[in-house]
């Protein structure tokens, strides 16, 4: 299964970020806790050289808690500051401001030596489409100050948000990178909704997810749909279609509808807490 999505506006957005990076002290990078490595744009490391770095494991309430901790340890070992958050319900948000101060302590000390007081920390908020940047900013700022959407590609243009916490945030559009060298990355991103569904083969993607869940979260499909997980992935999708009454005319099974139900249940956490890539040991 080949997955690629890099619309033209992302090239423009990347160029703008290259200019804006000169203005900031800290990069706050949101990643999807269900796919922490796959949801990191490799271009950010190049853009963010010599900048303090904070990774937010967002949507952590949807991800396997053991893997949340494993990924936190992994990124900390790479030199990042890391906080587990869920920007929708505010979980983990209280810790962020203290971590920002810690990440920028050298900048704060530099300002102090120069006699500069209370200059706000300027942070750029980055992440791939649909990772939850706008929701994070709204929750962190405590007011509706950035556009919100549940589809990739909603936030456009440049937005600075001044916070009372002595921090200025620069929101940026969600951008991917031109080519996924590893197709598994594209597939994982498609599963969590960071690539538009309407350019994907959702039935083929559903078969991938079924195979992954049977291997790594055995029994979770059986419990959710009251079906057997035995047989091929196609047979399991058929069982889900029957269990949820996904039928066309003449009693033909509606695989497309069953696939959408599967992804709605996965993405919303109705199946339970699931991580699609595990931290390296």
Question: Regions from the language model: what does each represent?
Answer:
Residues 87, 137, 167-170:
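Conserved active-site beta-strand-loop modules that form the wall/rim of enzyme catalytic pockets
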Residues 61-126, 145:
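Canonical P-loop GTPase G-domain recognition
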């Amino acid at each position: 299964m080949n997955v690629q999505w890099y619309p033209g506006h992302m090239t423009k957005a990347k160029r703008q970020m290259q200019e804006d990076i000169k203005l900031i002290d800290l990069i706050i990078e949101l990643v999807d806790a269900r796919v922490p490595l796959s949801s990191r744009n490799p271009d950010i490391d190049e853009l963010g050289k010599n900048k303090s770095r904070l990774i937010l494991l967002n949507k952590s309430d949807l991800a396997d808690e053991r893997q949340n901790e494993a990924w936190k340890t992994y990124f900390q070992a790479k030199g990042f500051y890391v906080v587990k958050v869920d920007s929708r319900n505010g979980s983990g948000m209280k810790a962020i401001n203290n971590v920002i101060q810690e990440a920028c302590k050298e900048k704060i000390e530099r300002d102090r030596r120069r006699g500069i007081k209370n200059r706000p920390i300027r942070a750029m908020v980055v992440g791939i489409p649909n990772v939850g940047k706008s929701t994070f900013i709204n929750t962190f700022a405590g007011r509706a100050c950035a556009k919100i959407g549940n589809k990739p590609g909603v936030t456009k243009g440049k937005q600075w948000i001044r916070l009372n916490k002595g921090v200025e945030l620069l929101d940026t559009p969600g951008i991917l990178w031109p080519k996924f060298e590893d197709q598994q990355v594209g597939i994982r991103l498609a599963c969590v909704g960071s690539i538009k569904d309407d350019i994907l083969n959702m039935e083929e993607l559903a078969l991938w997810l079924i195979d992954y869940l049977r291997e790594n979260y055995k029994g979770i499909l059986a419990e959710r749909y009251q079906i057997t997980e035995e047989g091929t992935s196609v047979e399991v999708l058929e069982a889900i279609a029957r269990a949820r009454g996904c039928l066309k005319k003449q009693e033909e099974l509606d695989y497309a509808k069953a696939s959408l139900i599967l992804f709605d249940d996965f993405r919303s956490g109705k199946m339970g807490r699931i991580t699609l890539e595990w931290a390296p040991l």
